[in-house]
């Protein structure tokens, strides 16, 4: 399931990327900035959806500095396949800093959970997976009926480049190469309702979007 060469290469490069990206960043300054970044995303979400203080929240594919950072007032679960490596090799991530989070080591494809979560975040992680179909199914399956799914994605802006990037590792970190409509349809075809789409950042190859869905029921 996670044995494809693109996925293995992406996981190797992901860790190296984080080491490179954080190499000159002071831990305290970076964590303060990143937490505020997530707080700003939550403010955007609040225009369209809300949840109670006793909500159960999942951060799927969290990485070392995920949405969990900004959810200190909630009961949170978070998972990522590289959490042990992040904690061992990055000074910017220690699980003990987040006592309100239940961390687990898992891929999206392997994550199986009863529908107990009111809100599921998957922030810039879905294009990292090996099996897109099972990963999408597992995200939805973790939600309670009527639950909220919030994603950020990098969506291709040009069909021609999307085809090229799919054929060769033009974007090594991301085995999945989709455009906005393809991302939206992954969830619409599974009965989710699209609540909001917001462009966060534009670039030549990719647009960075915030997507909000609600599970049927």
What do these predicted regions represent?
Residues 58, 62-109:
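Class I SAM-dependent methyltransferase SAM/SAH-binding core
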Residues 110-115:
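Short conserved loop adjoining the S-adenosyl-L-methionine
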Residues 146-154:
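Conserved beta-strand signature within the Rossmann-like core of class I S-adenosyl-L-methionine
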Residues 154-174:
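Short, glycine-/aromatic-enriched active-site segment of Class I SAM-dependent methyltransferases
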Residues 174-191:
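Short alpha-helix
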């Amino acid at each position: 399931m996670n044995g494809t060469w693109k996925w293995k290469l992406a996981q190797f490069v992901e860790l190296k990327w984080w080491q490179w990206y954080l190499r000159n960043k002071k831990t305290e300054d970076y964590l303060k900035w990143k937490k505020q970044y997530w707080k700003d995303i939550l403010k955007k979400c609040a225009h369209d959806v809300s949840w109670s203080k006793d909500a159960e929240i999942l951060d799927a594919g969290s990485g070392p500095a995920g949405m969990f950072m900004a959810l200190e007032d909630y009961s949170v679960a978070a998972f990522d396949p590289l959490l042990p490596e992040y904690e061992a090799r990055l000074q910017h991530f220690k699980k003990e800093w987040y006592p309100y989070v239940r961390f687990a080591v898992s891929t999206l494809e392997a994550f199986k959970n009863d529908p107990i979560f009111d809100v599921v975040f998957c922030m810039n992680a879905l294009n990292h997976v090996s099996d897109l179909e099972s990963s999408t199914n597992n995200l939805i399956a973790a939600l309670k009926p009527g639950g909220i799914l919030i994603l950020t994605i990098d969506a291709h802006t040009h069909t021609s480049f999307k085809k090229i990037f799919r054929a060769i590792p033009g974007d090594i970190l991301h085995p999945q190469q989709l455009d906005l409509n393809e991302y939206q349809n992954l969830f619409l075809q599974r009965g989710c309702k699209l609540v909001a789409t917001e462009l966060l950042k534009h670039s030549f190859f990719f647009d960075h979007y915030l997507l909000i869905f609600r599970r049927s029921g």
